[in-house]
Amino acid sequence: MYDKKEDYRKSHMGASKPKEYDPQFWIPGATNHLFWQIERQILLDIMDCLKPRPKRALDFACGTGRVLSFLEGHVPETVGVDISGDMLKLARHRCQRSQIIEGDVTTNPDLLTGKFDLITAFRFFLNAQPELRQNVLAALRRVLADEGILVANFHLNPKSITGSYLRFRHWLKGSNRAMMSLKEAKDLLESSGYKPVEIRGYGYLFHRRKQVRFLRLRGPLEKALAKINPYPEVALNFIVAARLR
């Protein structure tokens, strides 16, 4: 967890960051590996509902190219942008045909050209400071097509079972941990000129460790709950699809 007093832009700088960050999504049995499997299906579901299908997609804060490499298989033209050159080294190796841009969209409005039918932003808004969140959403708004869609992921809901446990644990320690509820996420998007049109929750069970206990039982159950999408307000993670207002 980065120091909240620092600018979040600095949080993924450094040659060691890709090795620290990336493996958790690819190790079978890891909690984030399970969540990434679910996220891929949610992305597919959202894209399948778009008419016409997206022809040009941007993955904002693409990091090591996890989401971007997935989009390559489903969208004709894909672009990734990130401020961390260290993370992008792995993204360039992983992504076969995407245009990958290093830079800050909040300070360089000419960094991105043209409009995008689909923009994804995963694992960014939770830890970014409020001003940076607003500035990023404004920058993305400029390049989102009129009928395009923004798909944003939020990965630590305080109203979930796991979130409630973590809040209590940090309270005992006298510390804080960044969290964002579904209402807070919707308010953030709406205040920046977006209208949420679909919400998908996942991570309904209690997850205390980085590895999923009883994976053969809990893995399929988590996937089934994500498909049913009963109460995204109490899921650990959620994805919000939003259009321009």
Q: Where are the predicted features?
A:
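A C-terminal cap/extension of S-adenosyl-L-methionine-dependent methyltransferases
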Residues: 167, 198-245
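Acceptor-substrate binding/catalytic loop of class I
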Residues: 168-184
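Conserved class I S-adenosyl-L-methionine
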Residues: 1-51, 54-61, 151-173
